[in-house]
């Protein structure tokens, strides 16, 4: 594929911002340290200003505040350099559109609705009574079981699976190995064994949701597990049955959300977070990586973390001993407080 080429004036005409210096041409985005004359880079954090002076980049995206320090360089001045960089990167890597057609090895059930604009890859499967929107891409070995509804321009990457009865909004993207709508982990103890509770709900994903590789979103026990518009979920995340996740929330890799958790909109959840079930997390909550969330978070905008920062093994071992002694130390402290209080009373 021939790389796209844009001048700075062409970029700003499309995306806004102000170009300064020469109206040079660029063919790709690169980090400051790797960029060459044909590349455009960006400065999002002022502490890396020295790297701009050392960089061979043909142009750099900067904020108005930072631009004054780079006279003689080719610049694009933007309000948010990082967001602007992302939009420039999209110019050079446009969304792939569906090539209409069904591969000869794909299986599409007769009762399925597949518009001519959809692309169905090798060995893909479309189940009975499933309806695809315009321009969907169901790539090699991907599976959409029966009675599903997919909006326009949905993409299922190779080996992604959508179980029966699920609903995906417009422009949803499901990466390889992800499973949408497998049975939730619902069991009732029968005295000497576990009885599986039928999971009769499904999964509903809003518009512009993205699901990373090998992530699982379980179907609801009775009502649907839901994910709101614009939410992005990383690789290897587990979303339990009956969860309700709001719009424009992001969840990083290896996080586990237990069943029946409600998460608000615009939340940021770091990697390796774990939650107990049946709790609520308010809008705009930020949870640091590795945190164990054991109770509801009811106040919007809280920033929470629950792990020790990295330390030497010797320091960690010493602190671990102190943790085990906290209960004993608390009792001793209460005894001392009581003794002090008794002493004051006798004076």
Curated annotation (Swiss-Prot):
Homotrimer. Belongs to the transferase hexapeptide repeat family. LpxD subfamily. Keywords: Acyltransferase, Lipid A biosynthesis, Lipid biosynthesis, Lipid metabolism, Repeat, Transferase. PANTHER family: UDP-3-O-ACYLGLUCOSAMINE N-ACYLTRANSFERASE, UDP-3-O-ACYLGLUCOSAMINE N-ACYLTRANSFERASE 1, MITOCHONDRIAL-RELATED. It is an enzyme of class 2 (transferase). Gene3D superfamilies: 1.20.5.170, Hexapeptide repeat proteins, MurE/MurF, N-terminal domain. Pfam families: Hexapep, LpxD. It catalyses: a UDP-3-O-[(3R)-3-hydroxyacyl]-alpha-D-glucosamine + a (3R)-hydroxyacyl-[ACP] = a UDP-2-N,3-O-bis[(3R)-3-hydroxyacyl]-alpha-D-glucosamine + holo-[ACP] + H(+). This is UDP-3-O-acylglucosamine N-acyltransferase.
């Amino acid at each position: 594929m021939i790389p796209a080429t844009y001048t700075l004036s062409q970029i700003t005409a499309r995306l806004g911002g102000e170009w300064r210096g020469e109206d040079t041409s660029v063919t790709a985005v690169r980090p400051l340290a790797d960029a060459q004359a044909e590349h455009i880079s960006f400065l999002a954090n002022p502490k890396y200003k020295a790297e701009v002076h050392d960089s061979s980049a043909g142009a750099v995206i900067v904020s108005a505040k930072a631009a004054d320090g780079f006279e003689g360089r080719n610049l694009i001045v933007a309000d948010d350099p990082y967001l602007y960089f992302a939009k420039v990167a999209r110019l050079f890597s446009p969304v792939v559109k569906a090539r209409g057609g069904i591969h000869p090895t794909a299986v599409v059930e007769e009762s399925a609705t597949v518009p001519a604009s959809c692309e169905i890859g090798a060995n893909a499967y479309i189940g009975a009574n499933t309806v695809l929107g315009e321009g969907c891409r169901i790539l090699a070995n991907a599976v959409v079981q029966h009675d599903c509804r997919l909006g326009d321009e949905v993409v299922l990457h190779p080996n992604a699976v959508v179980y029966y009865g699920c609903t995906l909004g417009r422009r949803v993207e499901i990466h390889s190995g992800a499973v949408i709508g497998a049975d939730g982990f619902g069991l009732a103890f029968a005295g000497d064994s576990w009885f599986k509770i039928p999971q009769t709900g499904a999964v509903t994903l809003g518009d512009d949701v993205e699901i990373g590789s090998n992530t699982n979103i379980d179907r609801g026990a009775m009502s649907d597990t839901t994910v709101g518009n614009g939410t992005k979920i990383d690789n290897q995340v587990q979303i339990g049955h009956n969860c309700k996740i709001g719009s424009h929330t992001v969840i990083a890799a290896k996080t586990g959300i237990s069943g029946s958790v409600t998460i608000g909109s615009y939340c940021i959840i770091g990697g390796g977070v774990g939650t107990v079930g049946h709790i609520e997390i308010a809008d705009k909550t930020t949870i640091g990586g590795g945190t164990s969330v054991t109770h509801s978070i009811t106040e919007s905008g809280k920033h929470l973390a629950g792990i020790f920062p990295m330390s030497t093994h010797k320091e960690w071992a010493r602190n671990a001993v102190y943790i085990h002694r906290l209960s004993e130390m608390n009792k001793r402290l209460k005894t001392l407080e009581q003794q002090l209080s008794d002493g004051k009373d006798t004076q």
